[in-house]
Amino acid sequence: MELSEIRNLLEGYAEKINGFRESLDLERLEEEIALLENDMAQPEFWNDQAAAQKVIDESNALKAKYDNYQAMNNMLEEAQTMLEMLQEEADEEMQAELEEMTIALGQKIESYELEIMLNQPYDHMNAVLEIHPGSGGTESQDWGSMLMRMYTRWGEAHGFKVEILDYQDGDVAGLKSVALRFVGRNAYGFLRGEKGVHRLVRISPFDSANRRHTSFTSVDVMPELDDSIEVDVRDADVKMDTFRSGGAGGQNVNKVSTGVRLTHIPTGIVVQSTMDRTQYGNRDKAMAMLKSKLYQLEMDKKQAEVDELRGDQSEISWGSQIRSYVFMPYQLVKDTRTGYETGQISNVMDGELDGFINAYLRWNL
């Protein structure tokens, strides 16, 4: 790498790091960290262990932002000093070291950009992702199961615990619906851009004539609320039905009525949980899902975006799609919002979604 190229890169990095400083408001960040540390030093801090742990997590997250910024800024200053020295006197060994440092700095900046893009109120929370195939029968239901596998692999590769909350088998293959829970910091922040209709074009393995089919499947994503957010749900407003639950792929979880379906009468929202072995456990999980949907609905009303963000896709068809997955006559996955695309469709279906997720977060800033 020539010195002129390194200089241009460092100038661009300096602009980005300066932008980070302005967006972070370092003085305010330092004050917030100091306030949290003061809370943690109080003798009664551990009286409520759950609340204490949340304060610790918040403090650690803010410190990480601050420390990462300082590390990048220090690396930039060191690189700029080395560049000045090399412009005065050539040194191959130092130039090789500077090149490595410049590459490493670029990688740090890219990671930091992603971190600060997760700045929405619920980005840090766990996520519940629901998959609902559209019309199209077995082909659409099989497409739903392919998406379930894709998201599960992505979650596991990124260290999230992935749980099945509810699973309804397809008529012949695939699934009629599934609800997945992603447990880990920033799960909702990473996944929120996946909400929408996903379109598949392929030669259907279920068509003896080997014709090309187009299928649509809806994906919905919502944050899983923690105890700091209270949602009051009146018992009189909720209808509970129980039924025998079956596991993914036809596995029988329990022969008694352990599955729970909750209907919120005022809004018509329906949620269900089937994967716990007890009715009590499924009711708790279904109620948590219902509260998340109701809270999201209320926030959306305040923003006058009920139809878009309620959690129900208006129409599983061409007009509302966010991404196309074309297997035939060529191979291409393209996000219709950001324009990001790749021909590596097998990798995408194996869970390599980072390019799409990162592009959405930047597009949505």
Curated annotation (Swiss-Prot):
GO MF annotation, one: translation release factor activity, codon specific
Pfam families: PCRF, RF-1
Keyword Protein biosynthesis assigned: yes
Record-listed N5-methylglutamine modification sites: 251
Primary subcellular site in the record, as a coarse category: cytoplasm
A GO cellular component annotation in the UniProt record: cytoplasm
Post-translational modification: Methylated by PrmC. Methylation increases the termination efficiency of RF2.
Xref: InterPro entries: PCRF, Pep_chain_release_fac_I, Pep_chain_release_fac_I_sf, PrfB
Annotated localization: Cytoplasm
Keyword annotations from UniProtKB, A to Z: Cytoplasm, Methylation, Protein biosynthesis
Gene3D superfamilies according to UniProt: 3.30.160.20, 3.30.70.1660, Release factor
Taxonomic superkingdom: Bacteria
Family per similarity comment: Belongs to the prokaryotic/mitochondrial release factor family.
Function of the molecule: Peptide chain release factor 2 directs the termination of translation in response to the peptide chain termination codons UGA and UAA.
HAMAP family according to UniProt: Rel_fac_2
Listed name of the protein: Peptide chain release factor 2
